[in-house]
């Protein structure tokens, strides 16, 4: 018996919409990363992008447990000397709520060209409106 290897041109990708309201950030991100990689499919192949497209709505309503709302810090560098910046989870949600989910999911995907291709299939929106109705996404309950 031969091992099945998925070919990029034969992979069937579905569109799903996920409502992040009240969902715990880490648990949501782990499941999104799993589905973006395609590990939920029987035809999963590690070196082929077999994952689905995922649209996340209501990113501003994602939850964290404990004191992480004030204690969790996000860091970035501007590129200038002494340009290290930081923001708490609460500040990030106020400034750019999509980034919170994007950063969490991106850290759970492979690093390299394949991981970047998987990450491009994730669409995150702060509110309940999205512009992917033409793809007829199915509701995914996580």
UniProtKB/Swiss-Prot annotation:
Pfam families: Ribosomal_L13. The keyword Phosphoprotein does not apply. GO terms for molecular function: mRNA binding; structural constituent of ribosome. The keyword Cell cycle does not apply. GO terms for cellular component: cytosolic large ribosomal subunit. Keywords: Ribonucleoprotein, Ribosomal protein. InterPro entries: Ribosomal_uL13, Ribosomal_uL13_bac-type, Ribosomal_uL13_CS, Ribosomal_uL13_sf. One of its GO terms (biological process) is negative regulation of translation. This protein is one of the early assembly proteins of the 50S ribosomal subunit, although it is not seen to bind rRNA by itself. It is important during the early stages of 50S assembly. Part of the 50S ribosomal subunit. Belongs to the universal ribosomal protein uL13 family. This is Large ribosomal subunit protein uL13. It comes from Histophilus somni (strain 2336) (Haemophilus somnus). The gene is rplM.
